[in-house]
């Protein structure tokens, strides 16, 4: 069984956190000790405890192990924009070694760590680096979240292609229905099943306020446990 994996999205706002929560809930139902890890988050609110990102908070709550927020999300950036822009404006340097130290600690504590990305695969974290470079360094297996909408086929196939070109293992994908009005849904799923060289872990239907719901029933985590 893998001890950590990375959640990538075909774009921003495709439901990475929804899928991450669903996977964490499904893993927890198997009796596994889990940690949700959001290394970099852009778009945070000031609280009495410090800056907090809502997606990172959902991961913190969905995991079975209770760890400090700063360990879930070491870089909570205020501005809701590309991480490299937010970091520059906030005079923050995102350091790979910090991300790696946290990940190593999480692996020691848990059975499996879910690492959620930010934006799409090549999202920059500085003027020269992307989060995907760190994922390559860590050699994390990848689960791809596909937001089912017009244009998702090209985005999904291109993202899967570059993940493999980067030398990483695509261990599964999740279909998340972000637009209930998307036509030809079944045909889109059929094409993804045919063209993506990885098992489908599940389909999450369109659900209002999905991040607040029990979603584990939509996910089959056996391919992850056998990877």
Curated annotation (Swiss-Prot):
Name the needed cofactors.
Mg(2+)
Which species does the entry assign this protein to?
Vibrio campbellii (strain ATCC BAA-1116)
* GO cellular component labels: cytosol
What is this protein identified as? ATP-dependent dethiobiotin synthetase BioD
Positions annotated to bind ATP: 13-18, 55, 116-119, 176-177, 205-207
Q: Which UniProt keywords apply?
A: ATP-binding, Biotin biosynthesis, Cytoplasm, Ligase, Magnesium, Metal-binding, Nucleotide-binding
Q: Which HAMAP family does the record cross-reference, listed alphabetically?
A: BioD
An annotated Gene Ontology molecular function: dethiobiotin synthase activity
Q: Name the residues that bind Mg(2+).
A: 17, 55, 116
Subcellular location(s): the record lists: Cytoplasm
Q: Which NCBIfam families match?
A: bioD
Q: Which CDD domains match?
A: DTBS
**Which Gene Ontology terms describe the biological processes this protein takes part in?**
biotin biosynthetic process
State the similarity comment: Belongs to the dethiobiotin synthetase family.
- What is this protein's function? Catalyzes a mechanistically unusual reaction, the ATP-dependent insertion of CO2 between the N7 and N8 nitrogen atoms of 7,8-diaminopelargonic acid (DAPA, also called 7,8-diammoniononanoate) to form a ureido ring.
What reaction does this catalyse? (7R,8S)-7,8-diammoniononanoate + CO2 + ATP = (4R,5S)-dethiobiotin + ADP + phosphate + 3 H(+)
Q: Which InterPro entries match?
A: DTB_synth_BioD, P-loop_NTPase
How does the record describe its quaternary structure?
A: Homodimer.
Query: What EC number(s) has UniProt assigned to this enzyme?
Result: 6.3.3.3
Active site per the UniProt annotation? 38
Q: Which pathway or pathways does this protein act in? A: Cofactor biosynthesis; biotin biosynthesis; biotin from 7,8-diaminononanoate: step 1/2
């Amino acid at each position: 069984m893998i001890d950590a994996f990375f959640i990538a999205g075909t774009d921003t706002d495709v439901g990475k956190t929804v899928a991450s929560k669903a996977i964490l809930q499904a893993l927890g139902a198997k009796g596994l000790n889990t940690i949700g890890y959001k290394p970099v988050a852009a778009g945070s609110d000031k609280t009495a405890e410090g800056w907090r990102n809502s997606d990172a908070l959902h991961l913190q709550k969905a995991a079975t192990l209770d760890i400090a927020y700063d360990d879930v999300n070491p870089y909570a950036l205020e501005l809701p924009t590309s991480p490299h822009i937010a970091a520059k404006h906030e005079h923050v340097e995102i350091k790979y070694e910090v991300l790696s130290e946290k990940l190593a600690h999480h692996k020691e504590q848990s059975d499996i760590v879910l690492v959620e990305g930010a934006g799409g695969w090549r999202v920059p974290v500085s003027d020269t680096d992307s989060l995907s470079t760190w994922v390559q360094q860590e050699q994390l297996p990848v689960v791809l979240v596909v937001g089912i909408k017009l244009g998702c086929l090209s985005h999904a196939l291109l993202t899967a292609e570059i993940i493999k070109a980067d030398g990483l293992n695509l261990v599964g994908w999740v279909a998340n229905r972000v637009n209930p009005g998307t036509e030809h849904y079944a045909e889109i799923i059929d094409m993804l099943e045919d063209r993506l060289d990885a098992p489908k872990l599940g389909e999450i239907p369109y659900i209002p306020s999905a991040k607040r719901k029990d979603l584990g029933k939509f996910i089959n985590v056996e391919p992850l446990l056998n990877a």
